[in-house]
Amino acid sequence: MRSIRYWLGGLVLIALTVNLAGCGINDIPRLDEQVKAAWSQVQNQYQRRADLVPNLVATVKGYAKHESDVLISVTQARARVGSLQLPANITENPQAFKKFESAQKNLTGALSRLLVVSENYPQLKADQNFLTLQAQLEGTENRISVARRDYILAVQKYNTELRTIPGRWYASMFYPDAKVKQNFTTAKENFKAPKVSF
């Protein structure tokens, strides 16, 4: 009789384990891993862009020597990006995340000014090395957009799981160290249409 009780108890335990595994208890670690993977892609693409900057600046410098203000701003923005000490938990650290985002926005702005200045130099625009770097930069900016989108979606799913039931319960019982992840902000000026006058 006792062996039947133990056997039934084991079956109930197995059934509970399977039931809990199937009802979302593993969603939090799974979604956390998706956020980490998406964040790695964001970092990879930003690093790819930062690696293009020295060659782009050197190419432009050869043609536009007196545009030193723009060249210096790009070089300084890249240096700020390169000097950031990112904590391992950056996606959970609002101050570090904002610092990273701000440095990347500064580099984006400086690169935009550099490309606008390059329009004034027809010889530069015809240079094959510049054209190649410009195409690589454009492709990298597209990759950054895709990586950021994927990260935003992963964070949205993760944060929603932590804030809704039953995910909130699972987090409090099984994952007490789970924290809401930081997400990118979009400046309101990005939504304004540019004014065109003829």
What is the role of each PLM region?
Residues 2-198:
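A helix-centric hydrophobic-segment signal that preferentially recognizes long
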